[in-house]
């Protein structure tokens, strides 16, 4: 159907060259740089198409079949697809796919299962936890009596004995298991036993490892936790958003009320469409193969870095991320993040357990393999990336402000590598 109204026919390039130009520059950046930020990934064209669909026009407050607006027949269809697919993916009885983010999903659980002033026990930020798990600057750290567990100073592994001791002493109403920067598997069964021993609810935030769990390469927290939250991006390779799972019908009712009307109004139906597509992709055998490559690539990258004299927190990784301790190289996280970006490699500065540096400086960086694996990198490519990272490290040791010649040479090699594995 032709439409003479330019409002509906003009492209972004025709209507807003400034925004279009910024998007094109971001596309070029993604095409020409190696993305090692562990929380980032690259979505499929199908997910992009779903997010750019006319569903962005639709208000759909409420839930499928129980909306507060008319005209929701097809919004219901899309949300029902997302719900059924994510339930199959994680073998869950109930799912809420409306949270706009992982933080919103976590907030909904706390609203549903805890009262202001209740004691909440989560992993400390400096040990690898997330802001929303009770860190002081976050809402969870302000509204609740938030206590933090950490890792062993000797092994850098999660200290389950400390979790148990804190739980026995303080009797939290909610225990949170999950992380933002922890490279090892979690023992969900032990967390549940600790929670049961003090009458607490167990929430697992699986945001970073949701894809690994979906592929069956990590224990499924749905089998142990009262409630599970996640983002839809990261290893799950979907749009930016969140969801909540539970097998408890009463908790499911509380979660639904906490998401809407408790925290949010209308759901973002175009994002939920993208979630449905990504969940469908994650149900395939191809996705399992992808996750196997993500894990193998993390091992390959870690092996090269360790061979080059770099310390990895806990000595390695069981998942998609590596936490690099830069102190043996005499380097800082912020310094390395900037140098690597100049060289065409993006990562993030990250505190390490018991870090003496400020969060804006840090003694470490966090690296991840999901995005590079999505574009087709295998172990050989990640070994090459590791070698180039080491070259930047060594140049920084000689020239702490940055070695332009080395960074530009590495950037050319990175660009050539990316050209072999194009995106979009």
Swiss-Prot record:
A biological-process GO annotation: glycine biosynthetic process from serine
Primary enzyme class: transferase
Keyword terms: Amino-acid biosynthesis, Cytoplasm, One-carbon metabolism, Pyridoxal phosphate, Transferase
Subcellular location: Cytoplasm
Pathway it works in: One-carbon metabolism; tetrahydrofolate interconversion; Amino-acid biosynthesis; glycine biosynthesis; glycine from L-serine: step 1/1
CDD domains from the UniProt entry: SHMT (cd00378)
Catalysed reactions, semicolon-separated: (6R)-5,10-methylene-5,6,7,8-tetrahydrofolate + glycine + H2O = (6S)-5,6,7,8-tetrahydrofolate + L-serine
PANTHER family (UniProt xref): SERINE HYDROXYMETHYLTRANSFERASE, SERINE HYDROXYMETHYLTRANSFERASE 1
HAMAP family recorded: SHMT
This protein's name: Serine hydroxymethyltransferase 2
Organism lineage string: Bacteria, Pseudomonadati, Pseudomonadota, Betaproteobacteria, Burkholderiales
């Amino acid at each position: 159907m032709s439409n003479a109204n330019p409002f509906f026919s003009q492209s972004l390039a025709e209507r807003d060259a400034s925004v279009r130009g910024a998007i094109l520059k971001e596309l070029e950046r993604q095409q020409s740089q190696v993305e090692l930020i562990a929380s980032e990934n690259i979505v499929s064209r199908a997910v992009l198409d779903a997010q750019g669909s006319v569903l962005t026009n639709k208000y759909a407050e409420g839930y499928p079949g129980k909306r507060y607006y008319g005209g929701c027949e097809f919004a219901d269809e899309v949300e029902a697809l997302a719900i059924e697919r994510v339930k199959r993916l994680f073998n869950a009885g109930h799912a809420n796919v409306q949270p706009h983010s992982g933080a919103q999903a976590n907030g909904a659980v706390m609203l549903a299962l805890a009262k202001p002033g209740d004691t909440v026990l989560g992993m400390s930020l400096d040990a690898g936890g997330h802001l929303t798990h009770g860190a002081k600057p976050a809402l969870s750290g302000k509204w609740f009596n938030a206590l933090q567990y950490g890792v062993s100073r000797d092994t850098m592994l999660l200290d389950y004995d400390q979790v148990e001791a804190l739980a026995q002493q303080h009797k939290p109403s909610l225990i949170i298991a999950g992380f933002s920067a922890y490279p090892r598997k979690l023992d969900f069964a032990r967390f549940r036993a600790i929670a049961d021993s003090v009458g607490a609810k167990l929430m697992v935030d699986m945001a970073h490892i949701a894809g690994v769990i979906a592929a069956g390469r990590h224990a499924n927290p749905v089998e142990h936790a009262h409630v599970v939250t996640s983002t839809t991006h990261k290893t799950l390779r979907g749009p930016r958003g969140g969801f909540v799972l539970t097998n408890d019908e009463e908790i499911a009712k509380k979660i639904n009320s906490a998401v809407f009307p408790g925290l949010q109004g209308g759901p973002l139906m175009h994002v939920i469409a993208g979630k449905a597509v990504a969940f469908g992709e994650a149900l395939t055998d191809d996705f399992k193969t992808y996750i196997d490559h993500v894990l193998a690539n993390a091992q390959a990258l870690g092996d090269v870095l360790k061979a080059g004299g770099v310390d990895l927190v806990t000595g390695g990784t069981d998942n998609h991320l590596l936490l690099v301790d830069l102190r043996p190289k005499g380097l800082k996280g912020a310094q390395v993040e900037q140098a690597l970006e100049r060289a065409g490699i993006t990562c993030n500065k990250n505190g390490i357990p018991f870090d003496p540096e400020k969060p804006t400086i840090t003694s470490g960086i966090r690296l991840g393999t999901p995005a590079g694996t999505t574009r087709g990198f295998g172990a050989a490519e990640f070994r090459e990336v590791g070698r180039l990272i080491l070259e930047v490290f060594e140049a920084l040791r000689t020239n702490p402000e940055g070695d332009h010649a080395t960074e530009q040479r590495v950037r050319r090699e990175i660009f050539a590598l990316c050209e072999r594995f194009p995106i979009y």
